[in-house]
């Protein structure tokens, strides 16, 4: 997910994207804790995407 794509979205769309990413992170965490997640790098990618979305939301809220 690119930052330019995120900046083009509205705050409502970003909040929906954030909720989806948080659900995805939860699912990956559960899979990792039960030993079912083979691609552990996905946790890091999702965590960083969450940070990106939160940063863009904060930037838009400040304007």
Curated annotation (Swiss-Prot):
Could you tell me the Gene Ontology terms of the biological process aspect for this record? translation
Matching PROSITE patterns, A to Z? RIBOSOMAL_L29
Q: Which residues form a coiled coil?
A: none
For molecular function, the Gene Ontology terms on record are: structural constituent of ribosome
UniProt xrefs under Pfam families = Ribosomal_L29
Q: Which CDD domains match?
A: Ribosomal_L29_HIP
Q: InterPro entries from the entry?
A: Ribosomal_protein_uL29, Ribosomal_uL29, Ribosomal_uL29_CS, Ribosomal_uL29_sf
Where would one find the signal peptide in this protein?
none
Keyword field contains Ribosomal protein: yes
**Which Gene Ontology cellular component annotation is one that this UniProt entry carries?**
cytosolic large ribosomal subunit
Keyword annotations from UniProtKB, A to Z? Ribonucleoprotein, Ribosomal protein
Q: Which family does it belong to?
A: Belongs to the universal ribosomal protein uL29 family.
The cross-references to PANTHER family, in alphabetical order and at most eight, read: 60S RIBOSOMAL PROTEIN L35/50S RIBOSOMAL PROTEIN L29 (PTHR10916), LARGE RIBOSOMAL SUBUNIT PROTEIN UL29C (PTHR10916:SF0)
Name the record gives this protein: Large ribosomal subunit protein uL29
Organism of provenance: Colwellia psychrerythraea (strain 34H / ATCC BAA-681)
Provide the gene name from the record: rpmC
